[in-house]
C-alpha cells in the first residue's frame, strides 16, 4: 500500500513534530484537533518547529523551498481530516477512555484501506485494537521527542496486525527519515 495522505490526531509536542516531519519529507498532512482553541495553540508550535528545521537541518539550508511546503492543513472537522487519508497517527492524551472515544468517532468515516497507528508510549496497541474496527490495520508507531534529531520510530503490531499494514508503516517511517525499530 502506498501512503500519500496522513492525518495526525493531536497537536501536542509529538503530534506537531510528527506532522511537520511528514510535511518536511513531502507528505500531505492534515492535523485533526478537537477545537478552534487547539488549532490556535498548534500554529505557534508548528511555526517554532519550522524555525528549528530551517536553522538546524542542512537540507533546509541548501534548498528551503523544497521542504515544508505548507502541506499541513489544520481542522476540527472529522470528515475533512479522516475521509481521504491513508494513514492516521493518533497522538492524543494517554487516557484509554479518550482513545476509545476517538477511534469510535472516526471508525465509520475512514476509507477501507486506511491504516491506524497510535503514538502511545504507555499503552500497548493490543489494549486499543478493539476500539478501531480494523484490528488488521492497527499498530503502534512511537516517535522520540525532537524527531528531527532523535530519528527513531518504534513499530509494534498486535497479534492481529496484517503483515501488509506492518510493512507499510515501516516503509512510511523510513520515508520520513526515521530509523524504524521493528518490534515483533
Which residues make up each language-model segment?
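Phosphate-coordination loops involved in phosphoryl transfer and adenosine-cofactor binding
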Residues: 2-5, 69, 85, 113
Amino acid at each position: 500500500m502506498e501512503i500519500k495522505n496522513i492525518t495526525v490526531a493531536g497537536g501536542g509536542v509529538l503530534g506537531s513534530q510528527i506532522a511537520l516531519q511528514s510535511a518536511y519529507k513531502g507528505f500531505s498532512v492534515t492535523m485533526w484537533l478537537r477545537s478552534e482553541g487547539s488549532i490556535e495553540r498548534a500554529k505557534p508550535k508548528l511555526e517554532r518547529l519550522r524555525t528549528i528545521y530551517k536553522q538546524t537541518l542542512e537540507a533546509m539550508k541548501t534548498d528551503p523551498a523544497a521542504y515544508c511546503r505548507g502541506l499541513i492543513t489544520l481542522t476540527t472537522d472529522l470528515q475533512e481530516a479522516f475521509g481521504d487519508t491513508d494513514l492516521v497517527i493518533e497522538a492524543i492524551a494517554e487516557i484509554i477512555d479518550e482513545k476509545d472515544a476517538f477511534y469510535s468517532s472516526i471508525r465509520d468515516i475512514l476509507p477501507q484501506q486506511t491504516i491506524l497507528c497510535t503514538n502511545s508510549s504507555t499503552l500497548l496497541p493490543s489494549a486499543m485494537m478493539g476500539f478501531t474496527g480494523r484490528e488488521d490495520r492497527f499498530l503502534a508507531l512511537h516517535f522520540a521527542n525532537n524527531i528531527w534529531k532523535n530519528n527513531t520510530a518504534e513499530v509494534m503490531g498486535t497479534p492481529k496486525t496484517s503483515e501488509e499494514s506492518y510493512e507499510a508503516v515501516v516503509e512510511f517511517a523510513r520515508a520520513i527519515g526515521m530509523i524504524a525499530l521493528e518490534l515483533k
